[in-house]
């Protein structure tokens, strides 16, 4: 009886081992097929993509994108970050007046852009004053210009 049981156990172990080995071999085969399939499919896909693209397509695409972006951009003034006449200014780099305009201060770093500064306004340079005369940080009358009343 013992020998029969031993034979049965031996048969079962053999059958189980053979099933496991076939499972492993089928798993390996499936993995190899997947790897081979993906490599060939990938290379075919790359070949198809490169066949469809011509040399002239890329520069035209880039050129049209640049043109559309340029059309969407606002016109940039000659000086960046400058204010036009009548706008807020502060006599700083970030809020300065454009061109020959001058910032007429009304308070501490608070002013508006004007053509030139009137008499008794704060100035640094003579060119900022309408009279072209800046003394002691104030625009002064020009003694050489006389206003003749009618």
From Swiss-Prot:
The keyword Ribonucleoprotein does not apply. Disulfide bonds join 116-130, 123-134, 129-139. Pfam families: UPF0506. One of its GO terms (cellular component) is extracellular region. Residues 1-18 form the signal peptide. It is found in: Secreted. Glycans are attached at residues 20, 24, 36, 48, 52, 110. Keywords: Disulfide bond, Glycoprotein, Knottin, Secreted, Signal. Its main location: secreted. The keyword Disulfide bond applies. Belongs to the UPF0506 family. The presence of a 'disulfide through disulfide knot' structurally defines this protein as a knottin. This is UPF0506 protein SJCHGC02380. It comes from Schistosoma japonicum (Blood fluke).
């Amino acid at each position: 009886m013992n020998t029969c049981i031993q034979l049965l156990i031996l048969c079962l172990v053999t059958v189980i081992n053979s099933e496991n080995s076939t499972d492993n071999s089928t798993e390996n085969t499936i993995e190899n097929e997947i790897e081979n399939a993906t490599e060939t499919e990938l290379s075919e896909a790359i070949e198809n993509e490169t066949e469809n693209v011509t040399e002239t397509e890329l520069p035209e695409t880039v050129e049209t994108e640049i043109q559309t972006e340029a059309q969407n951009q606002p016109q940039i003034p000659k000086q960046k970050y400058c204010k036009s006449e009548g706008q807020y200014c502060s006599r700083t780099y970030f809020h300065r007046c454009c061109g020959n305009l001058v910032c007429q201060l009304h308070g501490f770093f608070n002013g508006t852009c004007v053509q030139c500064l009137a008499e008794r306004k704060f100035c640094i340079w003579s060119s900022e004053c309408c009279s072209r005369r800046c003394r002691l940080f104030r625009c002064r009358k020009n003694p050489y210009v006389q206003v003749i009343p009618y």
